[in-house]
Amino acid sequence: MNIFRFLGDISHLSAIIILLLKIWKSRSCAGISGKSQLLFAIVFTTRYLDLFTNFISFYNTSMKVVYVASSYATVWMIYSKFKATYDGNHDTFRVEFLIVPTAILSFLVNHDFTPLEILWTFSIYLESVAILPQLFMVSKTGEAETITSHYLFALGIYRTLYLFNWIWRYQFEEFFDLIAIVAGLVQTVLYCDFFYLYITKVLKGKKLSLPA
Amino acid sequence: ELDDIGKDEL
């Protein structure tokens, strides 16, 4: 464990908590893409299948349980509990264009042709593009609530910090995983536009508005 | 091998 990975996990956890609280407290999922949350639930499910078979540490197991539980709770709130507030008309990104290519790619490019490894690889590829429906929805509605932009910032920063974690691990542990690094780079690049708007607007107290 | 270490990440 190193500081970058720890801060990354904290940032990821806080993004998940921010979103859960926003929906629960405001009893509304307006402006939130249910499709992205569905993709995240798939990402965690396919990545943490070894949750019960491969104990690494209490921290690792407990974080995995929290991630999986909270992603399902978020999907449940969007599609069931508060579905009346779900803005389906603006959440129109075709997720099959994300799931199919990443699934095919995980069969072609992986470290080991075994079910667990292919599912892990699929989850890494899918995570790198899972935020697209949400970013697409924000660009369609032309703006996002401030709390939603904080959620997106925390979520984007988590993988950016993981990039530094991989530099650290390459330097000091002679470890690197090219699949995770390339997917992490793609994931971070997708946020760049949003990072720019967040830093130039939201941090100055303005509302986040994307050129529609 | 190397790759197994990676699986300690979330």
Swiss-Prot record, chain A:
Q: What's the encoding gene here?
A: kdelr1-b
Residue ranges, annotated region (Interaction with the K-D-E-L motif on target proteins): 47-48, 159-169
Site (Important for recycling of cargo proteins with the sequence motif K-D-E-L from the Golgi to the endoplasmic reticulum) found at 193
Q: Which GO terms describe its cellular component?
A: cis-Golgi network; COPI-coated vesicle membrane; endoplasmic reticulum; endoplasmic reticulum membrane; endoplasmic reticulum-Golgi intermediate compartment membrane; Golgi membrane
Q: Which family does it belong to?
A: Belongs to the ERD2 family.
An example GO BP is:
retrograde vesicle-mediated transport, Golgi to endoplasmic reticulum
- UniProt keyword annotations, A-Z: Cytoplasmic vesicle, Endoplasmic reticulum, ER-Golgi transport, Golgi apparatus, Membrane, Protein transport, Receptor, Transmembrane, Transmembrane helix, Transport
> What is the protein's species of origin?
Xenopus laevis
- Where exactly are the transmembrane stretches of this chain? 5-24, 33-52, 59-79, 93-110, 117-135, 150-168, 179-199
Residue spans, topological domain Cytoplasmic: 25-32, 80-92, 136-149, 200-212
What does the UniProt record say this protein does?
Receptor for the C-terminal sequence motif K-D-E-L that is present on endoplasmic reticulum resident proteins and that mediates their recycling from the Golgi back to the endoplasmic reticulum.
Q: Where is this region: Important for recycling of cargo proteins with the sequence motif K-D-E-L from the Golgi to the endoplasmic reticulum?
A: 204-207
What name does this protein carry?
ER lumen protein-retaining receptor 1-B
